[in-house]
A protein has these predicted regions:
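Extended charged/polar low-complexity repeat regions
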Residues: 88, 103-408
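Residue-level recognition of conserved structural "scaffold" positions that shape functional pockets
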Residues: 17, 42, 55, 61, ...
Length: 408
């Protein structure tokens, strides 16, 4: 979604970025900067949310490359999606999901945004004017010659075009396609076969207009069933995503304490199954390795491209680059899991945040620059910086549909 786009109900899109849409090669719309309004380092005053619009951890050059980026928002939607592998509040582009209802298709990202389409028959397509997005159901070898996507459709492998159980999304006749399928799984011993397909579709890959593919590999069985554990990009490189459970992280923390001769800190073996940011299975991404590169098969990195550290409550605490140097750190509220109260780039001052009882940011503290305070009234938000300069935003709408109609 782009800021300012209109929905089918007449309101503007408020959870999106200025140029990134669902279907863009760099990821799903960021969902953390409604209306494009941010303040400071940064805060979205319309939602009263601490946001980080996008930080890229992996981006190697090449056709249809695998780009691993993170976005954060402290905003809590009324219909939260499950907590992803980066912990509460954080999102990755691959967390897109299509729900199949009786008469409705709901395309959702991990931030709780939803885009509704009518039921599609095989070979039919739906178009969202607000997103400039097509959703097409497979089941035909060719689209009508006059269709804007006819040429792009032919770039798909025949098995994808002919499968009525797959859906494909794109925001441009130039591509790429986002492939929405299902995770193959190992059936239970007493399960009646063939097992029915799930009532949802998840992102399984991308295909560009030249037929190059990026594939997301999901586990078929075990404790990580359905989770992405590998990616093959358009250059043929393979990345391995190392996942951990809360119990595994707790055991690792105990072993580190023993080897270091220190008293083990409180690190529970399980996490609550639900947070303000949605259901939580406790599975987290620990590291990403490059395991195959056709251009340099004998010269693979001896360390992960990125590594993540976690708090005992399953919150993203630190990011380490390929040299094992910590580049980011995050601190969260003791009471509200996933609510960020501070963050820091290595070598820079720590930026801190305070919230009110409704979970809205009221103060942003920067020891080496401008600090900000936020005052929330009905249809009015006042932002004051540490030089006593003031900006007043007059708004309309509520919650995620709030938009600025006048500035002072």
């Amino acid at each position: 979604a782009r800021q300012g786009d209109m929905t089918q109900y007449g309101g503007s899109i408020v959870q999106g970025s200025a140029g990134v849409r669902i279907g863009a090669p760099t990821g799903v719309a960021c969902s953390v900067c409604p209306g494009g309004v941010t303040s400071g380092h940064p805060v979205n005053p319309l939602l009263g949310a601490k946001v980080l619009p996008g930080e890229t951890d992996i981006a190697l050059p090449g056709p249809l490359p695998f780009i691993l980026s993170r976005t954060y928002s402290s905003y809590r939607t009324k219909t939260p999606a499950p907590v992803g592998s980066l912990g509460p509040g954080w999102k990755m582009p691959a967390d897109i999901r299509l729900q199949l209802r009786d008469n409705t298709l709901i395309l959702s990202d991990n931030g709780g945004r939803s885009l509704y389409f009518e039921h599609l028959f095989p070979g039919e397509d739906g178009y969202s004017r607000s997103e400039s997005l097509w959703l097409v159901r497979g089941g035909v070898a060719k689209l009508d010659e006059g269709h804007r996507l006819a040429a792009l459709w032919q770039a798909l492998p025949e098995e994808l075009r002919l499968s009525p159980h797959r859906y494909l999304a794109t925001n441009s006749p130039q591509g790429p396609w986002w492939l929405l399928g299902w995770c193959e799984r190992v059936p239970e011993a007493d399960e009646v076969l063939p097992a029915p397909l799930p009532p949802y579709r998840v992102l399984t890959g991308l295909v560009d207009r030249f037929g190059r593919t990026q594939t997301f590999h999901r586990e078929a069985a075990g404790e990580f069933s359905g989770e992405i554990t590998g990616v093959t990009d358009g250059a043929g490189r393979h990345f391995r995503l190392v996942l951990t459970t809360q119990a595994q992280r707790a055991e690792e923390a105990r072993q580190q304490a023993i080897s270091g001769g220190t008293e083990p800190s409180a690190f529970p073996d399980t996490l609550p199954g639900y947070t303000e940011y949605g259901r939580d299975n406790g599975i987290r991404l620990s590291a990403v390795w490059l395991t195959h590169d056709p251009e340099y098969p004998e010269n693979l990195p001896a360390a992960p491209l990125v590594r993540y550290g976690w708090t005992p409550r399953g919150e993203l605490a630190a990011v380490y680059d390929r040299s094992n140097t910590q580049v980011r750190s995050f601190t969260y509220d003791d009471k509200y899991r996933g609510r960020m109260v501070a963050h820091r780039h290595t070598g820079r001052p720590e930026i801190r945040y305070r919230y009110d009882s409704d979970g809205r940011v009221t103060e942003q503290l920067n020891p080496a620059g401008l600090s900000y305070t936020y005052q929330y009234e009905k249809d009015r938000i006042t932002i004051t910086d540490s030089l006593d300069r003031r900006e007043v935003l007059h708004t309309q709408g509520e919650a995620g549909l709030k938009r600025v109609v006048k500035k002072e």
